[in-house]
């Protein structure tokens, strides 16, 4: 039996309801949905059994139990609707934790889109400067639009980011400095006082982006974040994601923290939170303050 139902049936459903009855329609749709699902091809949602997938640093334990419950509820109750209210809830949670406002935060489907928006925006002002080894995928985005290639500075012999050499390379041709801390793929962590001093000096010359995707996985995460520099008015932006320790890489939720001016400027180059979905937002909201799950994941990661 065809599952071809017009929107008119649901809007003006008095005729259908009288003929079939509300429960009958529900049973009919349920039966057809089960039949349709059974005919779909098998989908692989993660690595095959026995395979340890390491290349993207996802949390192998996946979403927390609270997140899984929230995903199911949001999918059932909100799957038919756009996710604006849930996005506002997550914005408020992030803002409260860091003592900022909604206007300092831009949500995106994972941190990759917002990092790409920042790179494209910054490329209008000059080249992007980064170390030889860092997660450069998003900073390469402007190259597809004809922007110059990333200007790279050699890492030290110990694979650390050479902050002194990076600072010396900043001139009027640089539109943004991109640093990952902890760095990917080296795993090296910059001393917080050294990175803080660098960001303060460098941000007087150009925009500084610090990607903190792995911040929650290091000891004393608050000590290492550069978000206080944003609050202090420095030309610094910080990216975060729910894809790593929170186990939500497949749910696609991330965000950027910046000044109101930088947030508005970067958002011109993308759709921001409009790209998010109910299930992902529900999972992020349920996970954000789940300290027990984060402690477990950090110990086992």
For each predicted feature, which ranges?
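C-terminal segment of classical bacterial N-terminal signal peptides
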Residues: 22-28
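Short acidic capping loops at alpha-helix termini that bridge into adjacent secondary structure
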Residues: 101-105, 126-127, 212, 234-235
